[in-house]
């Protein structure tokens, strides 16, 4: 399986041709999902004792299986939260896989981690977080949010012995992403949802905290604000929420997985005022920073607190923490030990195009939303439910 022969060479050429053709297409076929039994009837048994051969397997992919996927980079794919990775990022995703880099520890992945960190410095600079703030790339917003809340929970538990035996409580809005509720289950903390049709404000948060019982208030350790809700792009009152969290000594997390890319746009940057006061921030480069799936990011005002929460110990890991292997170890700041250097495609795209191009692209997206809003208003057959953010 690992030898280099003529079959491997031919397969490599076929795969590279396919990749080049796919990258070169500006309007790929949208694709149509099919039932599992229908796909099975088309391709038959693909996993067998002797194998079906690379050529046959690849042809099945091209002829049947690829066509059962919806191409989310199609220019008219407007549903859900589509991704539109740059060609540079897509190409370097190939390089990332081909390079076979383990991105957990500096000792094994110094070059790749260096590139990730260069991209991360840019993201951190967009938030305005204070000197010393930093972050790591994750598999997505769910892993980033979970990593942040576990960090917050462990910090809260470290404050006194009573917190170690209490079940923590977090507050967020009803419009928060589903991953907040999911990660609360995993982190074994309770969640209180603030009912609001619009954004969560500092005033609403303060009233919610004042309505808590004495015991609930003792268990409250974090507030999760949203920097762009999934359904409507609503950005919470980050400044007001930050002020309440600071006064109440509560961890302030901002889930900007969806909207965080807009931090680069001067026209809407003011909507995120207050994010610079967060204790942690989630941003997904695979959404509005034009990276291929999967690439999330979690940022910390005090990375040391994340290290205290996530650094794994084991005799087999000691060598990675030896002085001779000293460097930044991404695994110490999030829940995953094994990780690919998923920030590499973003780094290459940024290095290729420059940050000004990113700003132009995001501003253009905002402009298109405004144009779409006006077109809907002018059309008597449809109704504009909400003004573009």
Please give the residue ranges for each predicted region.
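Active-site C-terminal subdomain of aminotransferase-like
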Residues: 274-380, 387
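Short Gly/Ser/Thr- and Asp/Glu-enriched loop/turn motifs at secondary-structure junctions
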Residues: 131-132, 385-389
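Active-site catalytic microenvironments for nucleophilic, acid-base chemistry
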Residues: 22, 122, 126, 151-158, ...
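Glycine- and acidic
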Residues: 1, 99-107, 130-136, 166-167, ...
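N-terminal entrance/gating region of PLP-dependent enzymes' catalytic architecture
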Residues: 1-132
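A residue-level signal for conserved active-site and pocket-lining positions in enzyme catalytic cores
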Residues: 9-12, 119, 148, 184, ...
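Conserved redox-cofactor binding core of oxidoreductases
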Residues: 84, 88-91, 137, 143-147
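Conserved PLP-enzyme active-site core in the AAT-like
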Residues: 140-307
């Amino acid at each position: 399986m690992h030898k280099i022969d003529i079959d491997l060479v031919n397969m490599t050429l076929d795969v590279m041709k396919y990749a080049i053709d796919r990258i070169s297409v500006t309007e790929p076929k949208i694709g149509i999902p099919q039932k599992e039994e229908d796909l099975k009837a088309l391709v038959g048994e693909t996993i067998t004792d002797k194998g079906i051969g690379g050529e046959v397997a690849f042809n099945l992919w091209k002829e049947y299986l690829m066509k059962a996927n919806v191409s989310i980079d199609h220019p008219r794919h407007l549903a859900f939260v589509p991704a539109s990775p740059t060609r540079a990022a897509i190409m370097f995703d190939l390089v990332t896989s081909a390079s076979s880099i383990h991105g957990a520890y500096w000792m094994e992945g110094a070059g790749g981690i260096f590139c990730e960190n260069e991209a991360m410095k840019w993201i951190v600079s967009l938030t305005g977080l204070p000197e010393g703030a930093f972050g790591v790339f994750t598999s997505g917003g769910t892993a980033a949010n979970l990593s942040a809340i576990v960090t917050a929970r462990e910090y809260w538990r470290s404050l006194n012995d009573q917190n170690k035996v209490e079940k923590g409580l977090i507050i967020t809005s009803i419009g928060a992403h589903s991953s907040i509720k999911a990660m609360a289950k995993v982190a074994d903390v309770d969640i209180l949802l603030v009912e609001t049709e619009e954004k969560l404000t500092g005033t609403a948060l303060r009233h919610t905290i004042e309505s808590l019982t004495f015991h609930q208030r003792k268990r409250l350790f974090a507030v999760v604000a949203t920097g762009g809700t999934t359904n409507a792009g609503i950005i919470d009152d980050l400044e007001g929420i930050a002020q309440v969290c600071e006064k109440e000594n509560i961890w302030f997390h901002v889930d900007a997985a969806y909207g965080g890319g807009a931090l680069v746009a001067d026209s809407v940057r003011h909507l995120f005022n207050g994010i610079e006061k967060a204790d942690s921030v989630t941003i997904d480069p695979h959404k509005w920073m034009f990276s291929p799936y999967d690439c999330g990011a979690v940022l910390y005002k005090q990375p040391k607190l994340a290290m205290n929460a996530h650094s794994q110990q084991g005799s087999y890991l000691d060598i990675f923490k030896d002085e001779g292997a000293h460097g930044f170890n991404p695994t110490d700041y999030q829940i995953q030990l094994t990780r690919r250097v998923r920030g590499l495609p973003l780094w290459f795209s940024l290095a290729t195009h420059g940050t000004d191009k990113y700003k132009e692209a995001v501003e253009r997206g905002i402009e298109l939303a405004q144009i779409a809003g006006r077109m809907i208003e002018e059309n008597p057959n449809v109704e504009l439910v909400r003004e573009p953010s």
